[in-house]
Design a protein with these regions (language model features):
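Active-site neighborhoods and metal-handling regions in enzymes and metal-associated proteins
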Residues: 1-351
Length: 351
């Protein structure tokens, strides 16, 4: 964790100190998993603040920082320790919290918006982070495999969703990285459909999007399964989405512009006449959060770096009819990406 704080200092430029209040960023920098904390990083000091409830937990988890038990107002206590040109996370700090900080900083301190500094460090994964995500991806793959035995037909979408989460937790996951999507038939045309108490029928497609958490790190994987003979046009739609993903995966390489990677899949889907049916971006970063930077989309800024963990997930959604999405979690390298999610991508039929 100390090395991460060192890298943050290197990225701070002219800032003399930086106040971090986002709990995910705090976990990344310190290892603290509690629900109340703040930290300050400068060239001379590493300070961690929490309240009485978490003092012992911080003693076990937080190393390389001076641990400080805050009084009744932790944010005010932290603000008093800021120095010089002081950055704060404007992506996280509310207007009211910013006002409080501004009232408490010592004379001469200049507060400067500095959101995104820690997030940019988080976007490039270390070996241990990749290992945790790979394990989380293996658990989601195993959950998909369990459906071959348990089946889908006759079970409700909600029953399947609950069962997948229970399977991953029983296999060692800390939990699900997001509420699962299990969407059958026309419900699959909703990209983030909520599982219903509705039985899954034969001869339809089912979009399933699941992920696990291991040591705080997330996985994310979508597969579209069949429960028999798919309806007319569904096989062609599946083949289209699969081809778009197959072409986009090798484009996700270090140095590639994020919007250019999106364009590879989007051009294929657009050319097939489904421009209006692919309304989301191609992918997003994954790590301590299931949605983080970088983003792959039509208007995405920046380029991929080696060590980025991103999803590649084209989809086509026909309202009132059917939906198809195929998603892999990959680690960006200088060449072909490393794919962490292993369940087959040819159309799998599950009874």
């Amino acid at each position: 964790m100390t090395a991460r704080a060192d890298r943050l200092v290197d990225a701070m430029g002219e800032l003399e100190s930086l106040l971090i209040t986002n709990l995910t960023n705090i976990r990344y920098l310190t290892g603290f998993t509690g629900t109340n904390g703040a930290c300050i990083v400068s060239r001379d000091e590493r300070l961690f603040f929490t309240d009485f409830r978490y003092v012992e937990q911080a003693r076990e988890q937080v190393a390389g920082f001076e641990r400080i038990q805050a009084g009744r107002d932790m944010l005010a206590d932290a603000a008093k320790r800021l120095r010089g040109r002081a950055g704060f996370d404007d992506h996280d700090l509310s207007v009211a919290a910013h006002r409080k900080v501004a009232e408490q900083v010592p004379d001469g301190v200049e507060l400067v918006p500095a959101g995104g500094l820690v997030e940019r460090l988080r976007a490039v994964k270390e070996e241990g982070e990749v290992a945790a995500m790979a394990t989380a991806a293996e658990l989601s793959t195993a959950a998909y495999e369990s459906l071959r035995e348990r089946g889908l037909t006759g079970r409700t979408e909600r029953e399947v969703a609950v069962g997948l989460v229970r399977f991953m937790e029983d296999a060692g996951a800390d939990g699900a990285s997001f509420p699962p999507v299990v969407a059958s038939g026309a419900h699959g045309a909703l990209p983030h459909a909520v599982p219903r108490n509705v039985e899954i029928l034969r001869d339809t497609l089912v979009v399933i999007d699941i992920g696990a958490i291991v040591d705080g790190y997330c996985s994310d994987c979508t597969r579209t399964l069949a429960t028999g003979s798919p309806p007319d046009g569904a096989l062609e739609l599946y083949a289209l989405v699969r081809r778009a993903q197959q072409e986009a995966l090798p484009a996700a390489t270090a140095g590639a512009e994020c919007r250019a990677v999106d364009r590879v899949a989007r051009d294929i889907i657009d050319a097939a006449g489904h421009e209006e049916h692919f309304g989301h971006g191609l992918g997003h970063g994954v790590g301590l959060q299931v949605h983080e930077g970088p983003r792959l989309g039509k208007t995405a800024e920046g380029a991929l770096e080696a060590g980025n963990a991103v999803t590649v997930e084209p989809g086509v959604y026909l309202p009132g009819n059917v939906g198809v999405r195929i998603e892999d979690l990959v680690i960006v390298t200088g060449g072909e990406p490393r794919i962490l999610t292993g369940f087959p991508k040819e159309l799998v039929t599950v009874g």
